[in-house]
Amino acid sequence: AAGWFGLFNGKDLSGWMTFDPGAWSVVGSGELSGRGPRSYLFSPGSYRNFILQAETRLNAKGDSGIVLRAALETGAPKGYEVQLCNTGDDAQKTGSLYNFQKVTESAIADDQWSKQTVAVIGNRILIQVNGKLLVDYPDKESTYTEGYIAFQQHDQASQVNFKNVRIKPLPDDIAAALTGLEKVFPALAEKKKPAAPSKPN
């Protein structure tokens, strides 16, 4: 598809950055794997407006996340976190925009692949899981404006895998960036449909 490119070559961690190299590896048929204590894996480049897609898999009680517009820093990087947590202890479940908009029930089973599609355009963040739009959030504070994509490995008990990671950078111009967004997020097209005329009694 036009404008999309893979962020991960499926073979090694070329271009990716981490402060905890022992936590991340490539396994299976081109999967990024996070294990061990909390750590983050940062994308080769930084982005402002974009759509990101990735398939993710978590173990039972696992906890992970995808941080958007993340700062390249040790510890928990500043940024918008897309939560990945199916049966873990955290009350904010898969699809939440962490600490901004909560999803309290996960429809994703442990050890099953699910597809995350997320977009950040200006101060608007969209999160879609397996084709269902869960979050369309306007951050009035515009808290984070540009940064890296950071995959989180949350804790020793968690095991997270990512595959088919791809990104579509979007223009800085908001109107241009929003053009055609409903092709990726079909629920947006539903919102645009005019209401059906009411029948007279």
Model-derived regions, located:
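Carbohydrate-interacting regions of secretory-pathway proteins
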Residues: 1-201
